[in-house]
Amino acid sequence: MTTRNTIILAAGKGTRMKSKLYKVLHKVCGKAMVDHVLTQVEKTDMSKIVTVVGYGADEVKSTLGDRTQYALQAEQLGTGHAVLQTEPMLKDEAGTTLIVSGDTPLFRAETFEDLFAYHEAKHAAATILTSMAPDPTGYGRIVRNNIGIVEKIVEQKDANSEEQEIHEINTGVYVFDNQKLFKALHETSNDNAQGEYYLTDVIEILKQQGDIVAAYQMANFDESMGVNDRVALSAATKIMRDRINEAHMRDGVTLIDPATTYIDAGVKIGADTIIEPGVLLKGNTVIGEDCYIGAHSELRNAVLADHVTVTSSLLEDSDMASGSNIGPNSHLRPESHIGPKVHLGNFVEVKKATIGEGTKVGHLTYVGNAKLGRNINVGCGVVFVNYDGKNKHETVVGDDAFIGSNSNLVAPLDVADHSFIAAGSTITDAVNRYDMAIARQRQTNKPNYYQKLPYRGED
């Protein structure tokens, strides 16, 4: 096997996207298109990877980091000109170079491997990746002679009626002999209507020199889909979503309705977990084995251990330990850490809090900036009052405490273990171990006062 390099073309602005975000940074299943391409390239054995950036260069670099080298195309003068910007990094390299666009998120590493293998087997100077398009309109056609050798690539606008009937199209992905690529690039011209240097001109130059130009036809046309507008972005997202969902199902995850299940590319799910319809799993969410994610739940960068149940709830940047459950209609906000066998019932909001093993927060409760120990009971309507108008303060509740319904815990506050807060109390001072705190007015009953009220109802 020869030395292999890759050039990813990611310099275009993408005006048809009609967006402030640069085209290759639009996301497909939670991941930038150019990141999808780089991820698949990384799975192959590459010596060097160079990404050509232009519009939004800093944003692209921030997204991809140091996983690739970068070349800047300051002026957008065509694909050939873009590749030429990598010359300082690649011109002295032997072997072969893959060229792929950053707006083609559906390519698989296996396709690149097959393309390299075909190129090397044919001893070609260039190999074009082609596919059979159901509707080839708009694509460059691959014209072969009667024994299957590539004669030329003809663009839609230049194709005659016979050539327009050809369904084999140019996907825009190539493998070149690296030395011959850069030599031929210096022979290209911008003497055309667009005033640009085209990479396809290199193919013609190599043929004129008598070099072998091959074409490898890939099996799956969908992989070659380029994204130029929001319609294509939606189509690519659907294909990727179906691919991701199928992979999880084959790994032992049950998706009740894959058509309404949305799983980002970075999500990991353990076997025997069940996902109900309408679920969104985003970012770097990790779900263990034997979990149950109920309908219309959304998890964003959440980490769930085994045997966790989520019922119609939103979890953000938080984690839940084994045997815990939440919902329905509850919300874990960032930096929440839920211990084993914790029960968070309906309409519970937790923010930047740690809740210990076996604690129960039944319903209609806000827990913010707090540390709760083990086996605590938090009654209905409890509020952890954490904000003084300027700063957030912390409440600490010890093991085996009991917080009665409709209580307010005003931070900063310490409630010791084995203590008891009476229902309806507003607690502002520390509560010691074994104490019961009551902070409410005594009830006053006024005899016969009902008859003095403007509205008395039926006698």
Swiss-Prot record:
<dbReference type="GO" id="GO:0000287">
    <property type="term" value="F:magnesium ion binding"/>
</dbReference>
<dbReference type="GO" id="GO:0000902">
    <property type="term" value="P:cell morphogenesis"/>
</dbReference>
<feature type="binding site">
    <location>
        <position position="228"/>
    </location>
    <ligand>
        <name>UDP-N-acetyl-alpha-D-glucosamine</name>
    </ligand>
</feature>
<feature type="binding site">
    <location>
        <position position="366"/>
    </location>
    <ligand>
        <name>UDP-N-acetyl-alpha-D-glucosamine</name>
    </ligand>
</feature>
<keyword id="KW-0479">Metal-binding</keyword>
<feature type="binding site">
    <location>
        <begin position="101"/>
        <end position="103"/>
    </location>
    <ligand>
        <name>UDP-N-acetyl-alpha-D-glucosamine</name>
    </ligand>
</feature>
<keyword id="KW-0133">Cell shape</keyword>
<feature type="binding site">
    <location>
        <position position="155"/>
    </location>
    <ligand>
        <name>UDP-N-acetyl-alpha-D-glucosamine</name>
    </ligand>
</feature>
<feature type="region of interest" description="Linker">
    <location>
        <begin position="231"/>
        <end position="251"/>
    </location>
</feature>
<feature type="binding site">
    <location>
        <position position="170"/>
    </location>
    <ligand>
        <name>UDP-N-acetyl-alpha-D-glucosamine</name>
    </ligand>
</feature>
<keyword id="KW-0548">Nucleotidyltransferase</keyword>
<dbReference type="InterPro" id="IPR050065">
    <property type="entry name" value="GlmU-like"/>
</dbReference>
<feature type="binding site">
    <location>
        <begin position="386"/>
        <end position="387"/>
    </location>
    <ligand>
        <name>acetyl-CoA</name>
    </ligand>
</feature>
<feature type="binding site">
    <location>
        <position position="423"/>
    </location>
    <ligand>
        <name>acetyl-CoA</name>
    </ligand>
</feature>
<dbReference type="GO" id="GO:0071555">
    <property type="term" value="P:cell wall organization"/>
</dbReference>
<feature type="binding site">
    <location>
        <position position="103"/>
    </location>
    <ligand>
        <name>Mg(2+)</name>
    </ligand>
</feature>
<dbReference type="Pfam" id="PF00483">
    <property type="entry name" value="NTP_transferase"/>
</dbReference>
<feature type="binding site">
    <location>
        <position position="23"/>
    </location>
    <ligand>
        <name>UDP-N-acetyl-alpha-D-glucosamine</name>
    </ligand>
</feature>
<keyword id="KW-0963">Cytoplasm</keyword>
<comment type="subunit">
    <text>Homotrimer.</text>
</comment>
<keyword id="KW-0808">Transferase</keyword>
<keyword id="KW-0460">Magnesium</keyword>
<comment type="pathway">
    <text>Nucleotide-sugar biosynthesis; UDP-N-acetyl-alpha-D-glucosamine biosynthesis; UDP-N-acetyl-alpha-D-glucosamine from N-acetyl-alpha-D-glucosamine 1-phosphate: step 1/1.</text>
</comment>
<dbReference type="GO" id="GO:0009245">
    <property type="term" value="P:lipid A biosynthetic process"/>
</dbReference>
<dbReference type="GO" id="GO:0009252">
    <property type="term" value="P:peptidoglycan biosynthetic process"/>
</dbReference>
<dbReference type="Pfam" id="PF14602">
    <property type="entry name" value="Hexapep_2"/>
</dbReference>
<dbReference type="GO" id="GO:0003977">
    <property type="term" value="F:UDP-N-acetylglucosamine diphosphorylase activity"/>
</dbReference>
<dbReference type="InterPro" id="IPR005882">
    <property type="entry name" value="Bifunctional_GlmU"/>
</dbReference>
<dbReference type="Pfam" id="PF00132">
    <property type="entry name" value="Hexapep"/>
</dbReference>
<feature type="binding site">
    <location>
        <position position="73"/>
    </location>
    <ligand>
        <name>UDP-N-acetyl-alpha-D-glucosamine</name>
    </ligand>
</feature>
<feature type="binding site">
    <location>
        <position position="228"/>
    </location>
    <ligand>
        <name>Mg(2+)</name>
    </ligand>
</feature>
<dbReference type="GO" id="GO:0006048">
    <property type="term" value="P:UDP-N-acetylglucosamine biosynthetic process"/>
</dbReference>
<dbReference type="GO" id="GO:0016020">
    <property type="term" value="C:membrane"/>
</dbReference>
<dbReference type="GO" id="GO:0008360">
    <property type="term" value="P:regulation of cell shape"/>
</dbReference>
<feature type="active site" description="Proton acceptor">
    <location>
        <position position="363"/>
    </location>
</feature>
<comment type="function">
    <text>Catalyzes the last two sequential reactions in the de novo biosynthetic pathway for UDP-N-acetylglucosamine (UDP-GlcNAc). The C-terminal domain catalyzes the transfer of acetyl group from acetyl coenzyme A to glucosamine-1-phosphate (GlcN-1-P) to produce N-acetylglucosamine-1-phosphate (GlcNAc-1-P), which is converted into UDP-GlcNAc by the transfer of uridine 5-monophosphate (from uridine 5-triphosphate), a reaction catalyzed by the N-terminal domain.</text>
</comment>
<dbReference type="InterPro" id="IPR001451">
    <property type="entry name" value="Hexapep"/>
</dbReference>
<feature type="binding site">
    <location>
        <begin position="9"/>
        <end position="12"/>
    </location>
    <ligand>
        <name>UDP-N-acetyl-alpha-D-glucosamine</name>
    </ligand>
</feature>
<feature type="binding site">
    <location>
        <begin position="78"/>
        <end position="79"/>
    </location>
    <ligand>
        <name>UDP-N-acetyl-alpha-D-glucosamine</name>
    </ligand>
</feature>
<comment type="similarity">
    <text>In the C-terminal section; belongs to the transferase hexapeptide repeat family.</text>
</comment>
<feature type="binding site">
    <location>
        <position position="377"/>
    </location>
    <ligand>
        <name>UDP-N-acetyl-alpha-D-glucosamine</name>
    </ligand>
</feature>
<keyword id="KW-0573">Peptidoglycan synthesis</keyword>
